[in-house]
Amino acid sequence: EQALTVPLLAGSGIVCPPVFEIRTFFENLARFRPTWYSAGFSHHSAILDAAGDYPKIVENNNLRYIRSGSGRLDPRVIVGLETTFGVPVIEGLGMSEVPCVTCNPLPPAKRKPGTVGIALDGNVEIMDDRGQLLGPNSEGQIVVRGSMVFEGYLEDPAATAAALVDGWYHTGDLGCLDDEGYLTIVGRIKELINRGGEKIRPGEVEVALMQHSDVKEAAAFPFPH
């Protein structure tokens, strides 16, 4: 939502294609010369893979930064995008219920690749299964409170009551905050794999697989057997 409203408030133009297509993306990059673009992690990977097919457009791009906000971005993709386009990649966390939870600041402020930045408004905390807030470097559910949090789900009081508890929106995401308030996402509660009583995060498996030079993409998920 903020990708649409903020530029309008600043008097800027917006290019919003109906569907994502690589060719259209690079054509728009050349035609409209945007100063930034926002996309999900899968789109960023596709853009990076195709950049070599559009060398002139990439060389003459007008970007000031690249924004990513739908999930944790592979560090290799971050390095690739920054090397290819010559601008910083700014990661953040947002969702329909809370449009912008956190974001890494623009340079020269401190940016921590692998994190989704610091809270922009309200409160972002980590909570355990008992509803207790945890301190820095402790893993738990990411919860958010503030004016940017939605009021509830339309005609679904049960879902609203489950998501909003004592003013805190329970995101369903697992994460931790460091000593400086930078947030790292480690997975989703519902995606935890229970193997012999041990809780395994799919993200950890995916990160390990992605360390291999022959692996381009990886996805881990539970499978009954």
Q: What residue spans do the PLM features occupy?
A:
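Hydrophobic alpha-helical segments, especially N-terminal targeting/anchoring helices
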Residues: R67, M127-D128, P136, T171, ...
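AMP-binding/adenylate-forming catalytic core of the ANL superfamily
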Residues: Y37, G146, E151-G152, A162, ...
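Active-site glycine-centered loops adjacent to acidic/histidine catalytic or metal-binding residues
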Residues: S70, G94, G117, G146, ...
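Conserved coil-to-alpha-helix start sites within the AMP-binding
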Residues: E1-L9
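Gly/Ser/Thr-rich phosphate-binding loop
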Residues: L9-S12, F26, P34-A39, L48-R111, ...
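Residue-level recognition of short loop/turn positions
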Residues: D128-Q132, E139, D166, D179-E180, ...
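Conserved ATP/PPi-binding loop(s) of AMP-dependent carboxylate-activating enzymes
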Residues: C100, I118-D121, Q132-A163, E198-I200
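ATP-dependent adenylate-forming carboxylate-activation enzymes
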Residues: S12-F32, F41-S45, I200-V205
